[in-house]
């Protein structure tokens, strides 16, 4: 994918994206990826730790070891970027990693514990070691909902969103650049279609609406249920423990519930071999994505400059073709298959280093705290 801002620099940027049993790392020089690796961590060793914070030294050690084995030189580093998470709701952008970011991320201030929250701590340690800047870029905690998207039918219950903000915003930034425009000048419906599915509305540089995929909103996905009737959920809840119901949102439903697999390629294979149930499940997911795109287009009052599709499942020509057929009456559909978190993090740092974008300071205050009159 081409870069939207045409940042031509010699900046050296190291990116870190922790997962459950591995940590993805990448080194960029002048906007080009010159090294990348997926650092594996022993699951049995990780299981010995009671918290994310306790994993930090072990993960750092395995990363340093791999870098040394591959003779990767981080001297002259300009910036380190960590994936982020666990922070309180914030506006999108590039944030300096300071003590408050470190505390809130590693202790999951938002109450959602995920290994990606180790990203800022790892990035800061590398940055301090090499005299570089340390940033987080559009973490999953980005929440820029407009007021109309915030209220629900229950007084005091407000919508929040957790979605693939990093990929969504980077896709929009880069596509705007291809159009010869800035992200802040455009309106897009942007989807990330992978293990989780995010559908979002972007107006003039802000993600004004989207589905809370952690909370179960939006289309069905490989392991997620998507939006379902409250009455049906209450009926289903009978005889189930709360912890099991929470798993329902993100772990054990979607493709897994219907077909016993989470790999979209297997679902496509079965459908292609005549499995009518697999075909129905696959097409239903796409149909729900299409409905979500239509809803987000309405949130933009039909003023849509493009419908952008990113994520691993966008490699499927069938998926892209169906969405184009259903939605291209709204705006042109553009496909950017694959995931590019590492590139997105590096691009964010480069924009700040190049003066294209201003770095922000995390306040530790939610971007939404309620309505005065409610």
Describe the residue ranges of each PLM region:
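Glycine-rich phosphate-binding loops at beta-strand->alpha-helix junctions
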Residues: 304-323
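Adenine-nucleotide phosphate-binding core of ATP-dependent small-molecule kinases
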Residues: 247-302
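Phosphate/pyrophosphate-binding loops at sites that engage ATP/ADP/AMP, CoA/4′-phosphopantetheine
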Residues: 65-78, 178-182, 292-305
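Glycine-rich phosphate-binding loop plus the immediately following alpha-helix
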Residues: 117-125, 136, 151, 156-187, ...
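Short beta-strand-loop/turn "lid" adjacent to the catalytic site in phosphate-handling enzymes
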Residues: 67-116, 133, 141-152
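Short glycine-rich, Thr/Ser-proximal phosphate-binding strand/loop in the N-terminal lobe
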Residues: 13-54
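Structural signal for terminal/edge beta-strands and the immediately following C-terminal loop/tail
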Residues: 337-374
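Conserved phosphate-binding/catalytic loops in two-lobed NTP-binding clefts
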Residues: 317, 321-347
